[in-house]
Amino acid sequence: MERVRFHGIFCDDMHTMHALEDVFPIPMETGVVETSFRQCAAAYDNLLAAGMKPFVELSFMPQHLAKEDVRGMFFYRPNICMPKDDQAWIDYIQSFVRFLIDRYGQEEVESWYFEVWNEPDLPVVFFHGTREDYFHLYEITARAIKEVDEKIRVGGPSTSGSKWVKSFVAFCKEHNVPVDFVTTHQYAGDPLGGVSDQGGPESAEETAVDEAMKEQMSNVSPEAVQQMFANLPKGAILPAIRSFMGDPLERDDVPDNVFRTNAPIVKEQAQGLPVYYTEWNNCATFSAYGNDTRKVAAYDVKTILALENVIDGSSIWCFSDIFEELHPFPEEFHGGFGLMTQSGIKKPVYYALEMLNGVGDMRYDLGEDAIDNEVGMAAFASDEGTQCILFRQKMKNNLDLPKEEAEISLEMDAAPRMVYMERIDQEHCNPLKVWEDMGSPQVPNPAQAAIIIEESEMRAEELPFVYEDGKVKMSVALGVNDVYCIRIVK
C-alpha cells in the first residue's frame, strides 16, 4: 500500500473554517471568518509517518462557502453543494495548497495526487448539482491548484460506475482545463448496463435515473416511511438496516465481470491519461453480511489478476471498518467494507492481498481463459521458485455446493525441495466464523480478539506432490470462494 484516500478533508468536523457566530451565539453574520488546516495536517502527518502518501480527495464543501445547506444522506452529513462564490472557493483551495507546501515541501506535495470531489454523479448522496456544475467546479479547482504549482497533479471526475469519463476528458480538452489523470469507481453491479457515457450532454437514461433518485429521496410521504419501517427488529441498528437493505449480491443475479468489462473502455476514453480506480470492491452495500466473508477475497483476487495491466492504479474500498458512513457500528463484524475490523482483525480479503503481495514479479502467460471461469489460476516466478494463486469465485456464497478438484502440473528441471500452501476457506483465515463460534461478542475484549486473530491467521502447510517425467503435480479441492496460494520451492 503506497497511498491512502479518504472522504471529507473539508467537512465541518475538520474545522477548516469558522465564523465568530459559530463560537458565540450571535444572531447575525459578523463577517469574521477564519481558516485553519491544523486537523488536515494531523491526518497527513500520520500518513507520512507511516511511510505512505495521501491521494487527496478534495471534499466536501465547508458550510461557510456553500451555496446552500444541503447535506448528503450519510451519517456524517457532508455539505454537498457548489460554492456560493467561485472566488472564495478558489482562495480557499489555494490557501490549502500553500499550507501543504509550506508544511511538507514543494517536492513532497508534487508527488501527491489531488482528486476533485467524490462521486458527483450521485445526487442526494454526494453532490447537489448537475454534470455541468461538476465540470465547472473541477475547472475552477484545477486552475486554482495549477496557479499555485503547475506541477501538482490534479484529476477527476471521481464518479461511480465508471461514468462521465469520456465527456469529462472531452470537456477538459475543449476548454483547455488542466487534467493529469482520470479517476472513477466500480463496484460489482453498478451500473449493470456498462459504461453509458458517450461524451455528450447527460443522456436521457442517466438523467432519468438521477431524477428518479432525487424524487425517491426527496418526496417520500410520511405514510410510506411509516410503512417501510413499521416492522423493524427492535434493539440494535444493524439488524434493522439489514432488514431493508439486505445483501444485493446474495439476493440478485449480479454478473462478476462488470469491472473487468468497463475498465478497458474507460482506459480508451481517457485518451492516454493515467486511469486510477480510486474505489472498487465486491459490494457497495455497507452492512451486507457477505462483506465479512471470503466471497470478497475471491472476487478481489480474480479482478486484480484480470486488470493489473489495464489500469494504472486502484484502491480497494476500504482499508478498515473504522468508517462512519452508516454510523460507527458496535458489532465487530457488521458487513463493513474494511480489510480489517475495528479491532484490527484481518478479514479473508486482507489475507488474499497478502498472498498476492508475496508472489514473484514475473507472471506466466497461462492463456486468456485462465482466470475467466469460476475456477481460475495465475502463476508467478521468483528467485525462490513458483507461486500459484487459485480461486473459485462465485457472486453468491453457495457453500453447500460440492468442492471442485483442481489439478496443477508444472514443468521443472528437478524435483522441488518442498511444496506448501496457504488457504482461505471455511476453516482457514475465517475470523467471522471464529467470532460467531465464540458467541459473536459485540465488542471482543482483548483476550477474545487475540483468540480470533490467532485462530484465523494465515498459516503455511505442506502440500503432497508427485514429481515425474520432468513435471511436479499436485491437487487441491476448492470450495465456493476459496482462495489458495501454492508455493513451489526450488
Feature map (PLM): residue ranges:
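Carbohydrate-binding surface patches
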Residues: 372-439, 480-487
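Aromatic/acidic polysaccharide-binding cleft in carbohydrate-active enzymes
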Residues: 277-401
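Mature N-terminal, pre-catalytic/accessory segment of carbohydrate-active enzymes
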Residues: 1-2, 6-7, 480, 490
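Active-site-proximal cofactor/substrate-binding loop regions of enzyme domains
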Residues: 182, 255-266
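C-terminal beta-strand-rich structural cap/linker in extracellular carbohydrate-active enzymes
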Residues: 443-490
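Substrate-binding clefts and catalytic carboxylate motifs of secreted carbohydrate-active enzymes
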Residues: 287-326, 414-454
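A structural motif corresponding to the C-terminal end of an alpha-helix
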Residues: 42-53, 99-108, 141-152, 262-275, ...
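Substrate-binding cleft and catalytic face of glycoside hydrolase catalytic domains
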Residues: 2-252, 285
